[in-house]
Amino acid sequence: MAKPILVTGFEAFGEHEVNVSEGVAKSLEGESVRGHYINSLILSVDYEGSNRVASILDYEEYAAIIHIGLAANSSHPRIEIRARDILDFKVPDNSGRLVKKSKISGLGDLYSTIEPNDWDIKTMIDAPVVSDDAGEYICNETLYRTLMKINDGTPCFFLHLPLKQDDAKGLVLQCLDRMLRPACIDVGAGALIQDGKFLAARRSQTEKHAGWWEFPGGKFEDGEDASMCLIREIKEELDLDIKTGEKVGEWIFDHGDVVVRLHVMECFVSGGKMKLHVHDKVEWCDGPDEVNWLGPDRDIAEAISARLKHHRR
């Protein structure tokens, strides 16, 4: 049986009559992400609550852990990637505890076990931001104590929510999906430009994703950057020698069984005669809607189309 996911929220505290994180956590109970069911837990806003998950980890294992809490002064959700080794309460916790300028362990700051650079955050609900300051209150203490106990790489972080958010539940589900999906594979994608047009190549019937159109390229090999990868891959796929130009951008796409980070660069033919090895057709395009693109390649084609005016004589 697949390990469960743990999502925690907090009860109300201080001047707040409700805590948005409590309702969000409760709403996720029993939901499933990539075959893992969610268990929800509401924590008290005190030492016992901050240490509860760390104690549970003595006898339970989870596929992923998200702590959710309220950041009343934030305008955007915050993905916290660091738990600071300090407590300095501005108000007492719900047990009356008021800790001032105190270390949690004395061992230094701890870092969340996630890779937000692989998450394509700009496409996520309500535009979350990555933060390295979880504060000096119970939220920070809870994340710190949980991270102290994790020794197997279980993905875990703290999500701070603003007072008002349109779809906090949807955002948490997006975070969990990214925590559990495969790590990104770096792939080069070449925007071959010639005579004011760019090249699209159709995958042959013997290839994965047969019949779909893409930009030529492939996976980085050890020690390669995007330019080196594309020079090698386009030679292998099309028998063309190329020079790389400006970087167009990066796109992350989840194919289900694999997640790729596409590094897209302008490319220019410098030699060779085109011969197709993994494709069965090519088209020179001057817009994004001339072929049926694979994955995010239509968005890439749109970005490249906007640049073509700089390459027309």
Model-derived features: positions:
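NUDIX/MutT-family hydrolases
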Residues: 266, 275-307
